[in-house]
């Protein structure tokens, strides 16, 4: 194990809109950020085929193209970007340590931007058809399913909200839930049930998503009788929750009951001095590229001001 003698002003963990925006702002502020992007840079947007709601791109842009442009912009300002995974951190005290392989790096401040991962069904066809009819974001992709028949999978508030939202575009929405009881709040469930475009299939699970090159249908199984059936649809929206990627910092910074990093008020300050968090790692609600980028900006500004106060 080798330890770098350089103490960086700031280390950023994670890429995606939050990490790259933090890197751009930190680099322009002459903080010379060291950024550990992970072995697959760009975050969740790397699997998003079309982004039409990010300001500045009138004709839209693909997720990978948007991330590549953000990455190139960070490089332009000489952020030190490294496609490596962080193995461990020690965030207490005036100098924080970040372990990557057999190297230990040090910094006065750390920005956490590891994001959150959408939960998946884990059925055949899901991974291959992601971006080709399978989605985890109705706000991002609903527009592309105008006048089509689609399904939403889930039983919580997010599933009800996404199903209701998708009725603005889709011809029909079938909400599939593996139980006959829902975790959703009463008001969200009633709102979905009152929508004439939404049909409920309870005690039902998807066993396979079909299509080549795009989704054409799903295979279903009744969880009570075992009876199998098929439903012709062109879209599958998976709304069974997200898992924040906070395991790296568990036991060091304060997390909420769902594992999201807690920040102070409207800032990006965490429970530890000199540690800031941004993007989907802290965001239960919006989970959009533009909001992640905004919080990445805020984290960098918070870190810059905090560092100035320490001098």
From Swiss-Prot:
EC number: 1.8.1.9
Family matches, as SUPFAM superfamilies: FAD/NAD(P)-binding domain (SSF51905)
Gene coding for it: trxB
Protein's UniProt name: Thioredoxin reductase
Cytoplasm in keyword set: yes
Record organism: Mycolicibacterium smegmatis
Keywords: Cytoplasm, Disulfide bond, FAD, Flavoprotein, NADP, Oxidoreductase, Redox-active center
Family designation: Belongs to the class-II pyridine nucleotide-disulfide oxidoreductase family.
GO CC annotations on file: cytoplasm
Binding site for FAD: 15-18, 37-44, 53, 86, 280, 287-290
Catalytic activity line of the entry: [thioredoxin]-dithiol + NADP(+) = [thioredoxin]-disulfide + NADPH + H(+)
Disulfide bonds: 137-140
Lineage of the organism: Bacteria, Bacillati, Actinomycetota, Actinomycetes, Mycobacteriales
Cofactors: FAD
GO MF term list: thioredoxin-disulfide reductase (NADPH) activity
Class of enzymatic activity (EC top level): oxidoreductase
Keyword Oxidoreductase tagged: yes
């Amino acid at each position: 194990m080798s330890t770098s003698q350089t103490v960086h002003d700031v280390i950023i963990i994670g890429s995606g809109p939050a990490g790259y925006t933090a890197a751009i702002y930190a680099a322009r502020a002459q903080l010379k950020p060291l950024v550990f992007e992970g072995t697959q840079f760009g975050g969740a947007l790397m699997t998003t085929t079309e982004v039409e709601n990010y300001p500045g791109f009138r004709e839209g842009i693909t997720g990978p193209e948007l991330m590549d442009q953000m990455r190139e912009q960070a490089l332009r300002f000489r952020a030190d970007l490294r496609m490596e995974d962080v193995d461990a951190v020690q965030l207490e005290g005036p100098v924080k340590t970040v372990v990557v392989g057999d190297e230990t790096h040090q910094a006065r401040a750390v920005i956490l931007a590891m994001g959150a991962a959408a939960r998946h069904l884990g059925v055949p066809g899901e991974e291959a058809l992601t971006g080709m009819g399978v989605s985890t974001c109705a706000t991002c992709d609903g527009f592309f399913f105008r006048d089509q028949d689609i399904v939403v999978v889930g039983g919580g508030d997010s599933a009800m909200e996404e199903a209701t939202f998708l009725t603005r575009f889709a011809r029909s929405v079938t909400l599939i839930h593996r139980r006959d009881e829902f975790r959703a709040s009463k008001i969200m469930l009633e709102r979905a049930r009152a929508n004439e475009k939404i049909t409920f299939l309870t005690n039902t699970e998807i066993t396979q998503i079909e299509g080549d090159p795009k989704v054409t249908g799903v295979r279903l199984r009744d969880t009570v009788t075992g009876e199998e059936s098929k439903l012709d649809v062109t879209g599958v929206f998976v709304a069974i929750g997200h898992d924040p990627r906070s395991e790296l910092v568990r036991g060091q910074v304060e997390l909420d009951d769902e594992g999201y990093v807690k920040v102070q008020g409207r800032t990006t300050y965490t429970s530890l001095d000199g540690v800031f968090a941004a993007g989907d790692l802290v965001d239960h609600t919006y989970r959009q590229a533009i909001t992640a980028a905004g919080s990445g900006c805020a984290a960098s500004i918070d870190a810059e001001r905090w560092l100035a106060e320490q001098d």
